[in-house]
């Protein structure tokens, strides 16, 4: 007996070990998740959605398991029949244990599958359903609050489809069980007949819910003149669904009565009625649409088109747009420009795409440092608002030498990036490079507002794995010449590496080194989920996060700001987003309701509600109390850096191309469809991206930080309007549309691009530069509204066709009305346009040169030719050597010499005209 007892204990131990081996990693992952959520202060959030998933999964598992088990148990209660030699039929005695196992095993697997699927699909919908917030907007057909469609309809649909699917699976299990036990015999079909009727009754009762859901979903119909329910949908299809629902009730009754009375005729009455309604309804739909609606579509569909216009504008927040007339034909003077110095001083002369290349070439310092992207923002510097580009210097562990990518280096030593680079958008050096206001390692600056005192970046866009800090291995901080500075983490983030936690993380990360490394001690802490996007998505998986976070310098600290969105595809009558490249493809309601901040040093993560009108985010706030803070609770230093979401603005401007038309007749006939204005970038025609400008809105003296995007008529290039999103203080989020008078013609960006290409002097220079291994980049064309007029500004970059090239700003093109000039600086261009020596406090000079052709107005024809040849040879040599600063200087000299040649007379004392002409005709770069 003692042996048996010991054997039992051994078996129990083996069973425990087996469970740990199989489920240990999952248990460890759950435990480490809980530890992490507790560490960052969001344990209630984790427990809430974990419990919700478990509760939903358990409830569905129980329902599906019991339904499947008992129906299968019924299928096994009939004993199989066997014929003996005299054709006598006998029943094989049933084995109760065996039949229960036959019913139990498939039911158990189906229940587990149903519970898992339902927990994933339903937990969020159920929580929102229980805590739903009214939208205070009703649909124009049924008069239901929009919240019904956000919360109720989504839940009902999911439950309906899951119920139908699992009912069908249970039905198939019953068929298979019967045929397995009885074989394909007459008796098996007889036994299944009654059961089929019961399942049919269940299905037709489910179909009642399906028809009612179909009726509600008519508000998203896409087969009419517009998105949403149209004339045929509401006059024919909706009544058909209601009649079909009644027919389903009748069908269930006739099936049940027919079964009891064993009357096939009675049982068939309901199905025949249901099929008849659906057939007649389908014919009626086609008849009404083709013979009543289509011949007079605009008159029949007009009220529904109005519904579509109104609800689409509400769904995307476009109903809040303020429209302002903007003539755009005002006359600007130099005095006007000097009154608008805040605008002039913030005109963006450097483009973000070449700028990121320059940052990585000049400021990465080491191969393992990388600038991921460049973001634009504004800072108050010396009492004035200044636009800047800012980019974080992150550490990319994958760029370490392969031999250096050891476990110690990746997880204990190379733990963080360092600092950031800041450059004003309107200043360039004499080499055409961005002027650095914050640069180097450690970061240095002469601008007090941009001082960085905590430059370490433990949480960023490239921090994709955990690190363990405060170990016996000092952390690499930053390079200092031939040596490296070292540091120890002093922040609050991290989970203490106790022995138990070490074991959990070793199991979770499948790495024994975490448990056994002697470099990890009781003071060590593990930092998890350091990628800021992964971090916020793990905390709030129900939000959609912008993939372009931006960095803010906050009193010396570095803080990431991330836009978070709520969205739905259930806004009645609202057109859906058709751009497949959009993160909201297929949705028809989007709000940038939340701003998230993540401290780059300690990972502190906070969620702020910035749109209180959004019922979705208000419901999430009820579901997860303590997760969201109000906008008033956001620190002022962060709040003044909030920007209107470019992603949302792109969605809104794309929708507004058509939905600015409020008249249903104009909308139906597409009489006034707009397009996003086009521009040339490099050599490619593309839609203009939204861009930020500093300007005073008409009627206001205050300069604001605005996000704008111009519109043109579809298939035309003149500009008809521009939409602005305000960003500052109490005006944050307000949209203003500036419309040009229909009777006036304002140059659109594509027309200005064409004028630049057709200008003989400009095109000649661009063609000369765009040869022999060099490339001209025509940067973003900026449309700058100033007072009641428009300036168009396009920086010109020059670069080489190799990976180490540094793009340089070599010219600025400015267009105003019918005038267009190209100069080395914005000041020079404005001076040429407005006839005065205009000097802004803005951009620095691009490459300037001094050469004889500039100063000597009395050179002879032969001297001018010689200057051209000399400048050409020097420019060609500089291009071959990749010396683009000198190249720009000699190209300036070449331009001046060519201009000087035009002023001289070929009848001067030249005896080499033919030779000179031959040589000049062979000049190409």
What are these regions (language model features)?
Residues 2-13:
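N-terminal membrane topogenic signal
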Residues 13-16, 22-881, 885-909, 913-925:
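Soluble extracytoplasmic regions of secretory-pathway and membrane proteins
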């Amino acid at each position: 007996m003692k042996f048996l007892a010991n054997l039992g204990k051994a078996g129990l131990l083996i069973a425990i070990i087996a469970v740990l081996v199989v489920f240990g990693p999952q248990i460890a992952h759950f435990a480490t998740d809980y530890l992490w959520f507790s560490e960052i202060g969001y344990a209630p959030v984790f427990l809430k959605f974990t419990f919700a998933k478990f509760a939903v999964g358990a409830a569905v598992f129980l329902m599906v398991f019991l339904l499947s088990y008992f129906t299968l148990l019924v299928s096994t209660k009939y004993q199989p029949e066997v014929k003996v030699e005299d054709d006598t039929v006998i029943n094989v005695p049933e084995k109760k244990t065996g039949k229960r196992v036959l019913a139990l095993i498939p039911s158990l697997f189906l229940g587990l599958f149903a519970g898992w699927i339902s927990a994933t699909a339903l937990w969020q919908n159920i929580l929102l359903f229980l805590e739903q917030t009214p939208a205070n907007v009703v649909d124009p057909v049924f008069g239901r609050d929009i919240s019904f469609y956000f919360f109720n309809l989504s839940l009902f649909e999911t439950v309906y489809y899951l119920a139908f699917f699992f009912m069908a699976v249970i039905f198939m299990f019953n068929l298979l069980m019967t045929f397995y036990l009885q074989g394909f015999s007459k008796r098996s079909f007889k036994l299944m007949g009654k059961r089929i009727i019961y399942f049919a009754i269940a299905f037709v009762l489910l179909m009642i819910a399906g028809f009612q859901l179909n009726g509600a979903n008519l508000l998203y119909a896409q087969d009419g003149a517009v998105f949403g329910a149209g004339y045929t949908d509401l006059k024919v299809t909706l009544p058909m669904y209601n009649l079909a629902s009644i027919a389903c009730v009748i069908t269930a009754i006739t099936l049940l009565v027919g079964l009891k009375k064993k009357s096939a005729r009675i049982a068939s009455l309901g199905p025949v009625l249901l099929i008849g309604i659906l057939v007649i309804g389908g014919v009626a739909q086609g008849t009404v649409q083709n013979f009543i609606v289509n011949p007079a579509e605009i008159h029949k569909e007009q009220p529904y088109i109005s519904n579509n216009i109104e609800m689409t504008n509400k769904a995307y927040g476009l109903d809040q747009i303020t429209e302002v007339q903007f003539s755009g034909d005002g006359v600007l003077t130099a005095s006007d420009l000097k009154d608008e110095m805040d605008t002039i001083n913030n005109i963006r002369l450097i483009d973000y795409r070449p700028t990121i290349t320059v940052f990585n070439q000049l400021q990465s310092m080491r191969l393992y440092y990388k600038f991921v992207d460049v973001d634009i923002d504004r800072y108050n510097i010396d009492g004035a608002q200044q636009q800047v580009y800012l980019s974080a210097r992150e550490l990319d562990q994958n760029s370490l030498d392969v031999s250096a990518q050891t476990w110690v280096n990746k997880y204990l030593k190379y733990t963080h990036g360092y600092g950031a680079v800041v450059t004003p958008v309107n200043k360039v050096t004499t080499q055409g490079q961005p002027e650095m206001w914050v640069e180097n390692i450690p970061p240095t600056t002469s601008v007090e507002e941009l001082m960085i005192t905590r430059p370490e970046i433990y949480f960023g866009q490239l921090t994709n794995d955990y690190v363990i800090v405060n170990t016996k291995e000092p952390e690499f901080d930053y390079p200092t010449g031939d040596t490296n500075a070292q540091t120890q983490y002093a922040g609050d983030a991290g989970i203490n590496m106790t022995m138990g936690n070490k074991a959990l993380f070793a199991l979770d990360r499948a790495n024994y080194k975490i448990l056994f490394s002697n470099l990890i001690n009781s003071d060590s802490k593990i930092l998890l989920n350091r990628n800021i996007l992964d971090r916020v998505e793990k905390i709030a998986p129900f939000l959609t996060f912008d993939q372009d976070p931006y960095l803010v310098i906050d009193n010396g600290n570095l803080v990431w700001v991330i836009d978070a969105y709520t969205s739905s595809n259930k806004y009645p009558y609202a057109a859906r987003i058709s751009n497949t490249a959009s993160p909201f493809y297929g949705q028809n309601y989007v709000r940038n309701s939340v701003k998230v901040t993540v401290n780059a040093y300690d990972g502190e993560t906070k969620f702020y509600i910035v749109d209180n009108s959004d019922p979705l985010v208000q419901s999430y706030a009820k579901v997860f109390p303590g997760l969201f803070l109000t906008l008033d609770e956001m620190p002022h230093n962060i709040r003044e850096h909030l920007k209107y979401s470019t992603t949302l603005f792109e969605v809104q401007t794309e929708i507004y191309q058509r939905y600015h038309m409020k008249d249903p007749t104009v909308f139906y006939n597409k009489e006034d469809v707009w397009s996003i204005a086009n521009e040339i970038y490099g050599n490619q025609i593309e839609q203009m991206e939204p861009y930020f400008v500093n300007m005073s809105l008409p009627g206001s003296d205050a300069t604001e930080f605005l996000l704008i995007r111009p519109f043109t008529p579809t298939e035309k290039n003149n500009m008809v309007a521009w939409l602005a999103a305000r960003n500052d203080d109490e005006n944050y989020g307000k949209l203003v549309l500036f419309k040009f008078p229909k009777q006036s013609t304002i140059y659109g960006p594509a027309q200005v691009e064409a004028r630049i290409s057709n200008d003989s002097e400009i095109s000649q220079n661009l063609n000369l530069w765009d040869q022999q291994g060099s490339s001209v980049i025509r940067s973003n064309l900026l449309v700058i509204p100033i007072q009641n007029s428009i300036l168009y500004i396009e920086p010109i970059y020059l670069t080489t066709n190799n990976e180490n090239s540094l793009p340089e700003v070599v010219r600025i093109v400015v267009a105003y009305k019918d005038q267009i000039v190209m100069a080395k600086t914005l000041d020079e261009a404005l001076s040429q346009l407005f006839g005065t020596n205009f000097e802004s406090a803005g951009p620095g000079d691009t490459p300037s040169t001094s050469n004889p052709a500039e100063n000597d107005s009395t050179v002879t024809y032969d001297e001018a030719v010689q200057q051209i040849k000399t400048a050409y040879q020097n420019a060609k040599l500089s291009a071959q050597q990749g010396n683009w600063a000198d190249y720009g200087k000699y190209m300036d000299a070449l331009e001046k010499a060519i201009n000087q040649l035009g002023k001289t007379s070929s009848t001067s004392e030249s005896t080499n005209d033919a030779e000179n002409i031959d040589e000049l005709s062979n000049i190409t770069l």
